[in-house]
Amino acid sequence: MASLVAGIDEVGRGCIAGPVIAAAVIFAPGQDTHGLADSKRLRPDRRLVLAGRICSESLAWAVGRAEVSEIDQLNILRATHLAMCRAVAALPVLPDWVRVDGNRYPPLDCPGEAIVGGDASVAEIAAASILAKVFRDREMEVLDRLCPGYALGVHKGYPTRLHIDRLASRGASFFHRRSFAPVRAVIDRSSAS
């Protein structure tokens, strides 16, 4: 019997707002994975098409997350690993082996490996990167509608010039990571006033 391999990737580590989202994907052995690529290399419309295909054609997929409060409490690496563990735990079948994009393997209960650049070389990881990106981008777009003024739908929580300017003029909101330097600086300035 062929082994089941899960790929895991995350989106949102470098953001100053919103959760970190991880996805885990398992393909059936021998399944066609043509067209998958690192989510950062794909246009948003192509990511959406591929995400639909991944959800409908993969053997299993799941998404895990770590909230802003967990990121601030644990640190971003531990919170990322927590999101990855939650994604694997949510899979309807357990993998025999896990491949994670990056240089550190999370504390999973199954064996595996960390692969630097895995989102560009391993189909399961590429698929996970696509799902994580689509899920997180959608969440940030919803948050943008609920809390207008920060342009979250544009920068998705990354520390762009636009985001930093809006953060400075509006102050930090509940979705900002207070343990991250740009957010902390805004909070410190407003406390000093």
Swiss-Prot record:
Cofactor comment text: Manganese or magnesium. Binds 1 divalent metal ion per monomer in the absence of substrate. May bind a second metal ion after substrate binding.
Biological processes, Gene Ontology terms: DNA replication, removal of RNA primer; mismatch repair
Keywords: Cytoplasm, Endonuclease, Hydrolase, Manganese, Metal-binding, Nuclease
Positions bound to a divalent metal cation: D9, E10, D101
GO cellular component: cytoplasm; ribonuclease H2 complex
InterPro entries named in the record: RNase_HII (IPR022898), RNase_HII/HIII (IPR001352), RNase_HII/HIII_dom (IPR024567), RNaseH-like_sf (IPR012337), RNaseH_sf (IPR036397)
Subcellular locations according to the entry: Cytoplasm
Signal peptide per UniProt: none
Known EC number: 3.1.26.4
Annotated catalysed reactions: Endonucleolytic cleavage to 5'-phosphomonoester
Class of the enzyme per the UniProt entry, highest EC level: hydrolase
Domain RNase H type-2: 3-192
Cofactor(s) required, per the database record: Mn(2+); Mg(2+)
GO molecular function: manganese ion binding; RNA binding; RNA-DNA hybrid ribonuclease activity
Gene3D superfamilies reported for this sequence: Ribonuclease H-like superfamily/Ribonuclease H (3.30.420.10)
Similarity remark: Belongs to the RNase HII family.
Function: Endonuclease that specifically degrades the RNA of RNA-DNA hybrids.
PANTHER family: RIBONUCLEASE H2 SUBUNIT A (PTHR10954), RIBONUCLEASE HII (PTHR10954:SF18)
Identification of the protein by name: Ribonuclease HII
Species of the source: Methylococcus capsulatus (strain ATCC 33009 / NCIMB 11132 / Bath)
